[in-house]
Protein backbone atom coordinates (compact mmCIF):
# COMPACT_ATOMS: atom_id res chain seq x y z
CA UNK A 1 0.00 0.00 0.00
CA UNK A 2 1.22 3.49 -0.69
CA UNK A 3 -0.48 5.50 2.03
CA UNK A 4 1.00 8.97 2.38
CA UNK A 5 3.76 8.42 -0.18
CA UNK A 6 4.20 11.60 -2.19
CA UNK A 7 5.98 12.18 -5.47
CA UNK A 8 5.85 10.63 -8.92
CA UNK A 9 7.84 7.64 -10.13
CA UNK A 10 7.49 8.51 -13.84
CA UNK A 11 8.30 4.88 -14.76
CA UNK A 12 12.00 5.31 -13.93
CA UNK A 13 14.45 3.74 -11.52
CA UNK A 14 15.18 5.73 -8.37
CA UNK A 15 18.71 6.70 -9.39
CA UNK A 16 17.57 7.74 -12.87
CA UNK A 17 14.68 9.77 -11.49
CA UNK A 18 16.83 11.59 -8.93
CA UNK A 19 19.53 12.35 -11.51
CA UNK A 20 16.90 13.60 -13.96
CA UNK A 21 15.32 15.96 -11.43
CA UNK A 22 18.71 17.23 -10.25
CA UNK A 23 19.57 18.07 -13.85
CA UNK A 24 16.16 19.62 -14.50
CA UNK A 25 16.17 21.79 -11.36
CA UNK A 26 19.69 22.95 -12.21
CA UNK A 27 18.58 23.92 -15.73
CA UNK A 28 15.43 25.62 -14.46
CA UNK A 29 17.27 27.71 -11.88
CA UNK A 30 20.04 28.53 -14.35
CA UNK A 31 17.86 29.54 -17.32
CA UNK A 32 14.71 30.43 -15.33
CA UNK A 33 12.46 28.54 -17.78
CA UNK A 34 12.46 25.13 -19.45
CA UNK A 35 10.16 23.19 -21.76
CA UNK A 36 9.16 19.70 -20.58
CA UNK A 37 6.24 17.32 -20.12
CA UNK A 38 3.47 18.20 -17.71
CA UNK A 39 4.00 15.39 -15.13
CA UNK A 40 7.73 16.17 -14.95
CA UNK A 41 6.99 19.88 -14.53
CA UNK A 42 4.52 19.25 -11.71
CA UNK A 43 7.11 17.24 -9.81
CA UNK A 44 9.91 19.67 -10.70
CA UNK A 45 7.88 22.51 -9.17
CA UNK A 46 8.31 20.88 -5.74
CA UNK A 47 12.08 20.63 -6.17
CA UNK A 48 12.46 24.21 -7.42
CA UNK A 49 10.34 25.68 -4.62
CA UNK A 50 12.41 23.75 -2.09
CA UNK A 51 15.70 25.06 -3.54
CA UNK A 52 14.49 28.67 -3.56
CA UNK A 53 13.20 28.35 0.01
CA UNK A 54 16.66 27.16 1.04
CA UNK A 55 18.14 30.12 -0.84
CA UNK A 56 15.92 32.45 1.19
CA UNK A 57 17.25 30.97 4.44
CA UNK A 58 20.81 31.55 3.35
CA UNK A 59 22.62 29.77 6.20
CA UNK A 60 25.43 27.23 5.90
CA UNK A 61 23.20 24.20 6.35
CA UNK A 62 20.85 25.43 3.59
CA UNK A 63 23.83 25.95 1.28
CA UNK A 64 25.01 22.38 1.93
CA UNK A 65 21.53 21.01 1.26
CA UNK A 66 21.38 22.87 -2.06
CA UNK A 67 24.84 21.63 -3.02
CA UNK A 68 23.70 18.05 -2.37
CA UNK A 69 21.08 18.51 -5.09
CA UNK A 70 22.49 21.14 -7.47
CA UNK A 71 26.03 20.19 -8.41
CA UNK A 72 27.01 23.37 -10.30
CA UNK A 73 28.61 26.04 -8.13
CA UNK A 74 27.50 28.91 -10.38
CA UNK A 75 23.87 27.86 -10.01
CA UNK A 76 24.23 27.49 -6.24
CA UNK A 77 25.69 30.99 -6.12
CA UNK A 78 22.77 32.29 -8.18
CA UNK A 79 20.26 30.69 -5.80
CA UNK A 80 21.72 32.45 -2.77
CA UNK A 81 22.77 35.73 -4.41
CA UNK A 82 19.84 36.43 -6.76
CA UNK A 83 16.86 34.12 -6.30
CA UNK A 84 16.75 34.09 -2.50
CA UNK A 85 16.63 37.89 -2.17
CA UNK A 86 14.25 38.19 -5.15
CA UNK A 87 11.61 36.01 -3.48
CA UNK A 88 12.28 37.09 0.13
CA UNK A 89 8.83 38.65 0.56
CA UNK A 90 6.99 35.84 -1.27
CA UNK A 91 5.81 32.96 0.97
CA UNK A 92 5.90 30.28 -1.76
CA UNK A 93 4.81 29.44 -5.27
CA UNK A 94 7.90 30.59 -7.12
CA UNK A 95 7.13 28.78 -10.39
CA UNK A 96 4.45 28.96 -13.07
CA UNK A 97 3.39 26.13 -15.37
CA UNK A 98 1.99 27.16 -18.76
CA UNK A 99 0.48 24.38 -20.86
CA UNK A 100 1.81 24.27 -24.41
CA UNK A 101 -0.19 21.66 -26.28
CA UNK A 102 0.78 18.09 -27.07
CA UNK A 103 3.99 16.60 -28.43
CA UNK A 104 3.74 15.47 -32.03
CA UNK A 105 5.36 12.05 -31.65
CA UNK A 106 3.52 10.58 -28.68
CA UNK A 107 0.88 13.20 -27.79
CA UNK A 108 2.40 13.85 -24.37
CA UNK A 109 1.10 17.02 -22.74
CA UNK A 110 3.89 19.59 -22.91
CA UNK A 111 4.36 22.74 -20.88
CA UNK A 112 6.68 25.58 -20.06
CA UNK A 113 7.77 25.85 -16.44
CA UNK A 114 9.28 29.18 -15.46
CA UNK A 115 10.22 31.20 -12.42
CA UNK A 116 7.77 33.95 -11.64
CA UNK A 117 9.18 37.43 -12.09
CA UNK A 118 7.50 39.99 -9.93
CA UNK A 119 7.21 42.91 -12.30
CA UNK A 120 5.29 46.02 -11.39
CA UNK A 121 1.91 46.09 -13.03
CA UNK A 122 1.03 49.29 -14.88
CA UNK A 123 -1.69 51.36 -13.21
CA UNK A 124 -5.15 50.58 -14.46
CA UNK A 125 -6.72 53.24 -16.63
CA UNK A 126 -10.27 54.10 -15.79
CA UNK A 127 -12.70 53.81 -18.63
CA UNK A 128 -14.20 57.06 -19.83
CA UNK A 129 -17.82 57.23 -18.78
CA UNK A 130 -20.26 57.47 -21.60
CA UNK A 131 -22.27 60.69 -21.62
CA UNK A 132 -25.96 60.25 -20.91
CA UNK A 133 -28.14 60.09 -24.00
CA UNK A 134 -29.11 63.58 -25.16
CA UNK A 135 -32.71 62.64 -25.95
CA UNK A 136 -33.41 61.47 -22.42
CA UNK A 137 -32.19 64.76 -20.94
CA UNK A 138 -34.35 66.85 -23.27
CA UNK A 139 -37.44 64.76 -22.62
CA UNK A 140 -37.11 65.02 -18.85
CA UNK A 141 -36.25 68.74 -18.94
CA UNK A 142 -39.28 69.79 -20.98
CA UNK A 143 -42.05 68.63 -18.62
CA UNK A 144 -40.33 70.16 -15.61
CA UNK A 145 -40.21 73.59 -17.25
CA UNK A 146 -43.84 73.30 -18.32
CA UNK A 147 -44.92 72.44 -14.77
CA UNK A 148 -43.19 75.52 -13.36
CA UNK A 149 -44.80 77.70 -16.02
CA UNK A 150 -48.29 76.42 -15.23
CA UNK A 151 -48.00 77.17 -11.50
Curated annotation (Swiss-Prot):
Region (Disordered) residue spans: 118-151
Q: Which GO terms describe its molecular function?
A: structural constituent of ribosome
The UniProt entry's GO biological process terms, in alphabetical order, are: translation
Where is there biased composition of kind Low complexity?
A: 131-144
What Pfam families does the entry give?
Answer: Ribosomal_L17
The record's SUPFAM superfamilies line, in alphabetical order, gives: Prokaryotic ribosomal protein L17
Provide the alphabetized UniProt keywords: Ribonucleoprotein, Ribosomal protein
What cellular component GO annotations does this protein have?
A: cytosolic large ribosomal subunit
Task: State the superkingdom.
Answer: Bacteria
Q: Which PANTHER family match?
A: LARGE RIBOSOMAL SUBUNIT PROTEIN BL17M, RIBOSOMAL PROTEIN L17
Per the record, the similarity remark reads: Belongs to the bacterial ribosomal protein bL17 family.
* Assembly mode: Part of the 50S ribosomal subunit. Contacts protein L32.
NCBIfam families assigned = L17
Name this protein carries in UniProt: Large ribosomal subunit protein bL17
Q: What organism is this sequence from? A: Syntrophobacter fumaroxidans (strain DSM 10017 / MPOB)
Amino acid sequence: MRHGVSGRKLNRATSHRLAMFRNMVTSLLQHERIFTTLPKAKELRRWADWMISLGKRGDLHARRQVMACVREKETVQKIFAELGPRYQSRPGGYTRIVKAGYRRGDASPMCLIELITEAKQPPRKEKAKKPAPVQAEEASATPASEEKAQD
